[in-house]
Structures are given as C-alpha cells and as structure tokens.
C-alpha cells in the first residue's frame, strides 16, 4: 500500500487547487505528525488493528510476533525505542485505528490537492555541473548539463574540491538565500542520488549521504527502492517510476522538496535544512560497477517567468 508523504487540510488555496508556497513547510510538519501516529514501524504501512505497547508506541496486531523478544524471556522489545513490554499488558488502541482509517479515506482527495504548485517553476534556475568537483570516472557533456559514469578514469587536475572516491559531482551556482527550482532528467536510470549539500562536505574518501553529514538527498537503488537520506533512512513510495525529478529549495524556510516533475506529485520534503553556509546541487549517476550507463541531465530553463519576490544577493538571477 502506498502512503502519502504530505498531509494538509481540505481547504483549497486562492491559487487554485494547489498549496501556497508559504504554507508548504507547515503542511509537511503536519504530515510528519500524522505519519508517525498512523503508520506501523514494523511493516511501514497504515496501522491495522493497532496494539499499544507499554512504551506508548504502536504496531499492527499482525506485526506483534515480528518484534524481537527479550533475551531469556517472552517479553517484547519495541523496535523504535527498545523498551520492554510485557505481553499481557499490550492493549488495542481504538483511537489510532480511527486515525489511520480516516487518513486512508482522505488519501485520494489529498493526492489531488497536493500536487506540485506550477508557481515553483517561476524560481527555475539555469544550472550547470561544476567540472572542478567531478570524480574522475565521470564523463561530462560539453554544455556541462549531462553526466554519466565511465569505466576509464579521466586525467583531471587534483583539486581540493574534487571528489576522489565517490562517483558524484556538484552543481553551479551555489545558493546562500532565496528560492530556487530545477529539474533533472533521470531517464531510465536504475540508480541515482539527487539533492543538495553543504559547501563544506568532505570531498576525499568515501562519503556517506546523511543529513547529519550535510547531504539532503533522495536516492534510487535497483530501479525501485527510493529513499531519503535521513537517519535512519526514510523509504519512499511513488505511484510511478520517476523520470524527471523537480527540486525546490527554499533557503528562507530551510526546506528542500522533491517532486515527480512530470506527474506533479510530491515525493519528499526535508525540513531544518542548514542555511548557515552555501548549498550546492548534488548529483550522482550510477557507479561503474553497476553497469548502468544512463545519462542524467539538468533540464534547461523554459520560460521561467519572474518571481514574486525580489532577488537578493547570493540568489541566482
């Protein structure tokens, strides 16, 4: 079963059937609370016949036997907080069952309302790839918009900003404030990482894509496993395979959102994105051992229009 990653009220915005950009972070905060309360930490699905543990966490009735047992005993360990619950003190939670049921009923309406706001494209940025940061296994197009992995290392200068082990590259320009939107054509690629990162991230040695290390990325593996770089990973569900990914960065609200740019549906939003230092687009195609030589491309800006907000220093013009 697929679950929404965004929840809001059923009141339509004055901009049509789309959320105003200023309310997007609030809607995402609401979504996190609803998701946490209505989903099972064992099966990651909506709670069915939820059972409340002594610690206050809840799991589906069918998932109770999947919980780890206490060593040398029959009591159960919560998979969220590792607290022990006695079997005879686990009780049904009717309130959570009603909440999960209501969210499931609202899902079709929410999907229709929570599509990508076309106004985001007014903030579309003309971006290119920064060749000085590219790993030497990457092959970059002459216009600096497309990249794929090769099997032969390129003879590039050894620069401090270049990634020497991990197969990735950053984008230009960097961002220090404002709102910015761009799209990446991932085509039929079965593996990629997209998002933003701090300017100060480590470039040498193998990197780990986590928010704690300054990476706010969405990743695809094996053609179908989609995840966000939270700790622990957040696994994502989409109705269709992503072929063009839209990314909206709002430095003022400290969030970055990912969309299916063709279908218009919301994929995931990171909150509390650090704005203390410049951020760069992060871009990683399939690595050479994968055998996938798909090209990932930054889509050109087409009639971006003008923004409602003034352009500030550090913002792309």
Swiss-Prot record:
Start and end residues of each B30.2/SPRY domain: 107-301
Keywords from the named record: Cell cycle, Cytoplasm, Metal-binding, Nucleus, Phosphoprotein, Zinc, Zinc-finger
Entry-linked PROSITE patterns: B302_SPRY, ZF_RING_2
Biological processes per GO annotation: innate immune response; negative regulation of G2/M transition of mitotic cell cycle; positive regulation of proteasomal ubiquitin-dependent protein catabolic process; regulation of gene expression
A Pfam family recorded for this sequence: SPRY
Gene3D superfamilies in alphabetical order: 2.60.120.920, Zinc/RING finger domain, C3HC4 (zinc finger) (3.30.40.10)
Post-translational modification: Phosphorylated by PKC and CDK1. The antiproliferative effect seems to be positively regulated by PKC phosphorylation and negatively by CDK1 phosphorylation.
GO molecular function: ubiquitin protein ligase activity; zinc ion binding
The keyword Glycosyltransferase appears for this protein: no
Zinc finger (RING-type) residue numbers: 40-82
GO cellular component: cytoplasm; nucleus
Keyword Phosphoprotein assigned: yes
Location within or outside the cell: Cytoplasm; Nucleus
Mutagenesis / variant outcome for changing residue 200 to A: Reduced phosphorylation by PKC, increased cell proliferation, reduced apoptosis and lack of cyclin B1/CCNB1 and CDK1 degradation
Tissue specificity comment: Seems to be expressed in prostate and less abundantly in adult brain, fetal liver, and fetal kidney.
Domain remark in the UniProt entry: The B30.2/SPRY domain is required for the negative regulation of cell proliferation.
Function: Negatively regulates the G2-M phase transition, possibly by promoting cyclin B1/CCNB1 and CDK1 proteasomal degradation and thereby preventing their accumulation during interphase.
Stated name of the protein: Ret finger protein-like 1
Organism: Homo sapiens
Taxonomic classification: Eukaryota, Metazoa, Chordata, Craniata, Vertebrata
Gene symbol of the encoding locus: RFPL1
């Amino acid at each position: 079963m697929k679950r929404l990653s965004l929840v809001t009220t059923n009141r339509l915005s004055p901009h049509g059937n789309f959320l105003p950009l200023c309310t997007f972070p609030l809607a995402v905060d609401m979504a996190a609370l609803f998701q946490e309360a209505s989903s099972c930490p064992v099966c990651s699905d909506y709670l069915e016949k939820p059972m409340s543990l002594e610690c206050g966490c809840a799991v589906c009735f069918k998932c109770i036997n999947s919980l780890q047992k206490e060593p040398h005993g029959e009591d159960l360990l919560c998979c969220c907080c590792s607290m022990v619950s006695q079997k005879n003190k686990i009780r049904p939670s009717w309130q959570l069952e009603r909440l999960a049921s209501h969210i499931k009923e609202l899902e079709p309406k929410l999907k229709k309302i929570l599509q990508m706001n076309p106004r985001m494209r007014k903030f579309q940025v003309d971006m290119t790839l920064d060749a000085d940061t590219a790993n030497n296994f990457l092959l970059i197009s002459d216009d600096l918009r497309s990249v794929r992995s090769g099997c032969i290392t390129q003879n590039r200068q050894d620069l401090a900003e270049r990634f020497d082990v991990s197969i990735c590259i950053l984008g230009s320009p960097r961002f220090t404030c404002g709102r910015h939107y761009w799209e990446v054509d991932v085509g039929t690629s079965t593996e990629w990482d997209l998002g933003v990162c701090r300017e100060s991230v480590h470039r040498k040695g193998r990197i780990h894509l986590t928010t704690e290390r300054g990476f706010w990325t969405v990743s695809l593996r094996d053609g179908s496993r989609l995840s966000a770089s939270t700790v622990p990973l957040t696994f994502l569900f989409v109705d269709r395979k992503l072929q063009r990914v839209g990314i909206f960065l709002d430095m003022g609200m400290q969030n970055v959102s990912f969309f299916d740019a063709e279908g218009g549906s919301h994929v995931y939003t990171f909150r509390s994105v650090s704005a203390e230092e410049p951020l760069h687009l992060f871009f990683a195609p399939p690595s050479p051992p994968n055998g996938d030589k798909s090209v990932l491309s930054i889509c050109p800006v087409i009639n971006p229009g003008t923004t409602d907000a003034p352009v500030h220093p550090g913002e792309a013009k």
